Amino acid sequence: MNIINFVIDDKPISAPEGTNIFQAALDNNVYIPGLCYHPKLSQFGGCRLCFVEVTERKRTGHRFACAHPVSEGMIVKVNTPKVSRYRKSVMEYLLAHHELSCPTCDKSGECGLQNITYEMNLAPGRFKTVRSHHPVIRDNPVLELNRNRCILCGRCVSACKEIEGIGAIDFQSRGFKTVIGTAFDRPLECSFCGGCVAVCPTGAWQDRTLGFKGRAWEFNSTPTICPYCS
């Protein structure tokens, strides 16, 4: 396998050929904001937050880090003024449509959207607040789906299809009416592995058995073997 040498923010980076910029940055402790990328899932490019400046073959342009492969000698800049303005606009748009229920959300404290909002020091944005008011779906004893918190990152859809091989959920409708759900809004029929909860960055998917049992920082992590993955 060929090794590609390039630069991110003046830091020399090496990565296997075919690696995308986002993963190469992760592997080398370089932070690029992102909410839809997951190393175990196919690239989706839905959140638009991993926007970076790329110079390769003497041409400079802008790319999404999760969808652009590394190339020999490329120069990547993560935080130029234009890049920062673009990311801020994307975040302002997401927050204008997102249910701000952080005090009662079990994801609070480990929420990707919350963390990036804090990092960017965002105040109320320029966009008019237009939030959805979907009913919370609790059609089974294990999982619940709050579409008002969903940013349509696609992680849960990919995890259900690619890891579990079930495909119980998918995108519904188009445009501003797009939501995550089951076919014909039928009750969820799956193995209830919790993969959707594990990969969700915003708390749209929740484990009903853990609701209000503690804050994210109060739980201890324990190495274990997942019966669905072993």
What are these regions (language model features)?
Residues I4-E72, P81-Y86:
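N-terminal cofactor/phosphate-binding cores enriched in small/glycine residues
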Residues S230:
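Short, surface-exposed beta-strand/loop patches at domain edges
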Residues R48, V52, E56-P227:
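Fe-S ferredoxin-like electron-transfer domains
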